[in-house]
Amino acid sequence: MSQLDALREMTVVVADTGDIEAIKQYQPQDATTNPSLILSASALPQYASLIDDAVAYAKARSDDKAQLLIDAEDKLAVNIGLEILKIVPGRISTEVDARLSYDTKATIEKARQIMKLYNDAGISNDRILIKIASTWQGIRAAEVLEKEGINCNLTLLFSQAQARACAKAGVYLISPFVGRILDWYKAAEKKEYAPAEDPGVISVTNIYNYYKQYGYQTVVMGASFRNVGEITEIAGCDRLTIAPPLLKELAESNAPLVRKLEYKGEVKTRPAPLTEAEFYWQHNQDPMAVEKLAEGIRKFAVDIEKLEAMLAAKL
């Protein structure tokens, strides 16, 4: 049995890509996209018709240049999601514009808009996750959306404070990042880490155990991996979203895989929710989390602007 097949027996495997051919090859349960992956996918020739459709959709809705871009961008992300949903049996995660990460109201409106595009294409809410950055404002938006039946995937999650706030808000799923945490520590500490000592692995393990210890139903989906060792060290996590090169490596390995995450203790009484002040104080005690959250939002915003430049040339 390959490591990938062994992993599927203990964890829901998700493909972290917008590449339809890769998704067909590895047959994940779900798929996740983000602005960077949408940008990469848009360069593939098989997506040309999806771009043309998004442009035509935008032109039919507005004459305003700024609105045209917004509409085309949303429709393209949904078009790619629709293609992926023809292959995966589960859900697609589609991300809200990262530039709205500190605006609760705008995030809610954008999420509703994305979901409407899917609904108009005949896709029900239970096949979509709306990805939102795990800022205080994003978490508050997700809290509202979950009550409306719009499930959310809270991404760019690096701190225990973010994880606690997401759990209390009742979000459907969180994506704690592994590899980006490792990147920060390697740069800061000037050292290499064995998989079991990887700070990203330790972070996800702690979050997983915290959620199970207090009986939270929020799904923990480890994300952002730099090597297979990070994946095997958190085998047993609820879900793992994995890029095609690492899916390939797992599929080609027959090394034994041991389940690492499994909580068997008692469920305890939940702690009081964090106030906004407590959230910021605790999150800001972790310089890695502060820097990586801000950097992640900036990077996604840059790729959104590149995507808009590509679309603007066609509008």
From Swiss-Prot:
Its primary localisation, in coarse terms, equals cytoplasm
Looking at its record, which EC class is this enzyme?
A: transferase
Q: Does the keyword Cell membrane apply?
A: no
Catalysed reaction(s)?
D-sedoheptulose 7-phosphate + D-glyceraldehyde 3-phosphate = D-erythrose 4-phosphate + beta-D-fructose 6-phosphate
Location(s), subcellular: Cytoplasm
Would you tell me the Gene Ontology cellular component terms? Answer: cytosol
* Gene Ontology process terms (BP): carbohydrate metabolic process; pentose-phosphate shunt
Kindly indicate whether the keyword Phosphoprotein belongs to this entry. Answer: no
Q: Which domain of life is it from?
A: Bacteria
Q: What is its EC number?
A: 2.2.1.2
User: Which keywords describe this protein according to UniProt?
Assistant: Cytoplasm, Pentose shunt, Schiff base, Transferase
One GO MF term on file is: transaldolase activity
Q: Which InterPro entries match?
A: Aldolase_TIM, TAL/FSA, Transaldolase_1, Transaldolase_AS
The pathway is: Carbohydrate degradation; pentose phosphate pathway; D-glyceraldehyde 3-phosphate and beta-D-fructose 6-phosphate from D-ribose 5-phosphate and D-xylulose 5-phosphate (non-oxidative stage): step 2/3
Q: Which residues form the active site?
A: K131 (schiff-base intermediate with substrate)
- One Pfam family of this chain: TAL_FSA
> Which family is it part of?
Belongs to the transaldolase family. Type 1 subfamily.
Q: How does it assemble?
A: Homodimer.
Summarize the protein's role.
Transaldolase is important for the balance of metabolites in the pentose-phosphate pathway.
Q: What is this protein called?
A: Transaldolase
| The organism of origin for this protein | Actinobacillus pleuropneumoniae serotype 5b (strain L20)
Q: Which gene encodes it?
A: tal
